[in-house]
């Protein structure tokens, strides 16, 4: 599923991401835009053999199990396929675990490069939340 900007903001808010670990909702919407273009089915293979999955491009080396990543830790205890669902609950729950790490949202390269230090509130402007 490809979410609309405000549709995704509303879903993320409902699932408790707004101000989770101090990151406002706009940060999450911005991250999703530049990680997956709001597409829950996005997958991208990395040079180390791991794959990033779903709307927040969660990595199989650490966070989920896809059965083909050597030394996978599966710290979210989920199959990576769960991160491709049109229902973003699994992605959000895993993202909460990721952002609770000391690096916070810096774990997301796209957030670090495209969202960090910008006016992320613009991503939810005009949305009825």
Curated annotation (Swiss-Prot):
Matches recorded under InterPro entries: Glyco_hydro_22 (IPR001916), Glyco_hydro_22_CS (IPR019799), Glyco_hydro_22_lys (IPR000974), Lysozyme-like_dom_sf (IPR023346)
Q: Which GO terms describe its biological process?
A: defense response to Gram-negative bacterium; defense response to Gram-positive bacterium; killing of cells of another organism
Q: How does it assemble?
A: Monomer.
Q: Which GO terms describe its cellular component?
A: extracellular region
GN (gene name): LYZ
Name the UniProt record assigns to this protein: Lysozyme C
Q: Name one Pfam family in it.
A: Lys
- Note on file? Lysozyme C is capable of both hydrolysis and transglycosylation; it also shows a slight esterase activity. It acts rapidly on both peptide-substituted and unsubstituted peptidoglycan, and slowly on chitin oligosaccharides.
Query: Which reactions is this enzyme annotated as catalysing?
Result: Hydrolysis of (1->4)-beta-linkages between N-acetylmuramic acid and N-acetyl-D-glucosamine residues in a peptidoglycan and between N-acetyl-D-glucosamine residues in chitodextrins
Please list the residue ranges annotated as the C-type lysozyme domain: 1-129
Q: Which Gene3D superfamilies match?
A: 1.10.530.10
Superkingdom of origin organism: Eukaryota
Q: List the disulfide bonds.
A: 6-127, 30-115, 64-80, 76-94
Instruction: Provide a Gene Ontology MF annotation, just one.
Output: lysozyme activity
Per UniProt, subcellular location reads as: Secreted
Q: Which SMART domains match?
A: LYZ1
Name the major location.
Answer: secreted
The entry's keywords: Antimicrobial, Bacteriolytic enzyme, Disulfide bond, Glycosidase, Hydrolase, Secreted
Q: Could you tell me what this protein does?
A: Lysozymes have primarily a bacteriolytic function; those in tissues and body fluids are associated with the monocyte-macrophage system and enhance the activity of immunoagents.
Membrane-spanning residues? none
The active site consists of: 35, 52
Q: Give the record's family classification.
A: Belongs to the glycosyl hydrolase 22 family.
EC code: 3.2.1.17
């Amino acid at each position: 599923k490809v979410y609309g900007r405000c549709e995704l903001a509303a879903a993320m808010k409902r699932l408790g991401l707004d101000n989770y670990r101090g990151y406002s909702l706009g940060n999450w919407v911005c991250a999703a835009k530049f990680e997956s273009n709001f597409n829950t089915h996005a997958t991208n293979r990395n040079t180390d053999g791991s794959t990033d999955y779903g709307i927040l491009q969660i990595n199989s080396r650490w966070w989920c199990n896809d059965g083909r990543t050597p030394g996978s830790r599966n710290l979210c205890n989920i199959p990576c396929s769960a991160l491709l669902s049109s229902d973003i609950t699994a992605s959000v729950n895993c993202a909460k675990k990721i952002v609770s790490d000391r690096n916070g949202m810096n774990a997301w390269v796209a957030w670090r490069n495209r969202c960090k230090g910008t006016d992320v509130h613009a991503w939810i402007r005009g949305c009825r939340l």
